[in-house]
């Protein structure tokens, strides 16, 4: 079941998955219960993040899972975050504390390989007060997409065995107890 409270995004998802027989849509979650809830780069958009984690818990079956990703490191917070309507970035400690009523299955930074180039770029642009490009033409760049695919696949393999010491984002898998 796909739940998306934002109207434009909801319409987009309905169009994208209109021919899928396995995808259901819910405009209101109500008291529905799920075995898995994925919140990929969602929580940082919500002013009261503790409240949304409580809501996620209420919509999980007993022993259900939340897979969540958020941007990492407050020192990287920039105008781009504001443009994306982010309220915050997280440290591992803050994110762990947010899910303190859950069992932690996995908690790690990710987007580790690109951390230094991205962090340095953000910090330089903040220092010289240049804003990020506001609009990027929406054309796929196959070379970059292929490179990112390879890098993220490599990180996925590393994450099976190790937690990463830093990264642009954090991933957590939490189990309701």
Predicted stretch roles:
Residues 1-78, 91-96, 172-176:
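Conserved SAM-binding loop
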Residues 13, 78-82, 117-121:
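Short aromatic-enriched loop/helix-cap "lid" or pocket-rim segments at secondary-structure transitions
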Residues 17-21, 84-87, 122-126:
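Short, hinge-like loop/turn segments at secondary-structure boundaries
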Residues 74-81, 130-133:
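Short glycine/proline- and charge-enriched loop/turn segments
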Residues 78-97, 108-111:
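Acceptor-substrate binding/catalytic loop of class I
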Residues 103-106:
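Short secondary-structure junctions
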Residues 111-177:
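A C-terminal cap/extension of S-adenosyl-L-methionine-dependent methyltransferases
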């Amino acid at each position: 079941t796909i739940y998306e409270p934002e109207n434009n995004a909801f319409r987009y998802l309905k169009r994208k998955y209109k021919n899928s027989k396995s995808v259901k849509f819910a405009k209101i979650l109500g008291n529905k219960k799920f075995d898995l809830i994925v919140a990929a780069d969602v929580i940082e958009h919500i002013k009261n993040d503790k409240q949304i984690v409580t809501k996620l818990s209420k919509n999980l079956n007993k022993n259900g899972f939340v897979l969540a990703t958020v941007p990492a490191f407050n020192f990287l917070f920039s105008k781009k975050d504001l443009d994306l309507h982010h309220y915050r970035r997280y440290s591992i400690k803050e994110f762990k504390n947010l899910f303190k009523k859950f069992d932690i299955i996995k908690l790690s930074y990710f987007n580790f390989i690109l951390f230094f180039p991205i962090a340095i770029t953000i910090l330089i642009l903040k220092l010289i007060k240049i804003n990020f490009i506001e609009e990027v033409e929406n054309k796929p760049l196959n070379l970059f997409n292929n490179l990112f695919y390879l890098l993220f696949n490599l990180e996925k393999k590393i994450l099976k065995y190790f937690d990463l010491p830093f990264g642009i984002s954090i991933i957590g898998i939490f189990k309701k107890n």
